[in-house]
Amino acid sequence: MSTKDWAEKDYYKILGVSKDAKPEEIKKAFRKIARDNHPDSHPGDKAAEARFKEASEANDVLSNAKKRKEYDQARSLFGSAGGFRFPRGGAQTSVNVEDFLRTASNGDGFGDLFGNLFGASGGRRTASRSPRRGADVEGETTISFDDAVSGTTVTMDMVSQAPCQACRGTGARAGTVPRVCSTCQGSGMHASSAGGVFEMTEPCPDCHGRGMIVEDPCQVCHGSGRAKSTKSMQTRIPAGVEDGQRIRIKGKGSPGENGGKAGDLYVKVTVRPHEIFGRDGHNLTVTVPVTFPEATLGAEVEVPTLAGTTVRLRIPAGTPNGRTFRVRGRGVPRSDGSRGDLLATVEIAVPESLDDDARHVVERLRDSLPQATPRPWEVK
């Protein structure tokens, strides 16, 4: 792709973001497009593959502050003006190219702008293949409620793109090797001129910037040099993780290319519910059934903890149904080493059936209590 073609592509439009979009907005937009169009999810869908590649190209430029600045500068020269041209014919015009380019590039000057964009600031140079960061990988795991509170290590089988083992990343069939591109002599770059005035370098159209041409492609990766790789890995789930939370593990995604860093692993955690306890942030919740006499007269009851022990909880006389008591320090661990609390909510247990003696006792209690109704809407 020539520099002019590169500048004329609207990467902002491809990702669906504004020209002043923040890095996190660009990252979010690219992830959505990549997730919806990833070749692994749409095998054989050329349109989805094209959208994925186009979005990857746009993200590669816009997510890099230096490349984004150069791209915006190139757009101001080529994209918005329909191409950079000197006047031809008619009156001779004296143009100070250094001043013009310094103005167009916000003061960076001829050497900085064209040196960065075209790979040279005076004369031709050979460009090496730049490192590329590996793709991020998504994974899922399901753990118990107890493990979510205390933290655990899980074994996960992850599928990612890695150098093809069959061809060792060359893209060529086993027993063969790629040949050096005769067009660029292995540099991966091709010289072209802009109106006979400037000489620029751009990715070689024959080898697409690789410097090598695969004539007999690998049957596993079909010449790409990359293939699906499944590996088993130990993943640490931190204490206090919540149901549905995504955990980022740096450097555990797909391997990079040409010495680039590996991508990240994002693990979505599903937590199985507990029979007794619930969660409210860093607090644990538990329902404590009490009898009517206990709630009315007061009592001390034992309340379970997630550690398997119990604590004594004092129920004051006249405790209403639904009142919550706080047991400090018996909740979920925080990152600073402290813990949340245990929230114990009283639930008055009503017997489903009574024998005659018990019924008479309740009736006598009813008759001895004040006749005022507890329902405010019935008060006259």
Curated annotation (Swiss-Prot):
Compositionally biased region (Basic and acidic residues): 32-56
The keyword Chaperone belongs to this UniProt entry's keyword annotation: yes
Disulfide linkage: none
UniProt subcellular location: Cytoplasm
Residue stretches of each CXXCXGXG motif repeat: 164-171, 181-188, 204-211, 218-225
Cellular component, GO, one term: cytoplasm
Database matches in InterPro entries: DnaJ, DnaJ_C, DnaJ_domain, DnaJ_domain_CS, HSP40/DnaJ_pept-bd, HSP_DnaJ_Cys-rich_dom, HSP_DnaJ_Cys-rich_dom_sf, J_dom_sf
Any one GO MF annotation of this record: unfolded protein binding
Main location (coarse class): cytoplasm
Annotated binding of Zn(2+) 2, by residue: C181, C184, C204, C207
SUPFAM superfamilies hit by this protein: Chaperone J-domain, DnaJ/Hsp40 cysteine-rich domain, HSP40/DnaJ peptide-binding domain
Keywords for the protein's UniProt record, in alphabetical order: Chaperone, Cytoplasm, DNA replication, Metal-binding, Repeat, Stress response, Zinc, Zinc-finger
HAMAP family in alphabetical order: DnaJ (MF_01152)
Family: Belongs to the DnaJ family.
Entry text on domains: The J domain is necessary and sufficient to stimulate DnaK ATPase activity. Zinc center 1 plays an important role in the autonomous, DnaK-independent chaperone activity of DnaJ. Zinc center 2 is essential for interaction with DnaK and for DnaJ activity.
Self-association and partners: Homodimer.
Name of the protein: Chaperone protein DnaJ 2
Organism: Cutibacterium acnes (strain DSM 16379 / KPA171202)
Originating gene: dnaJ2
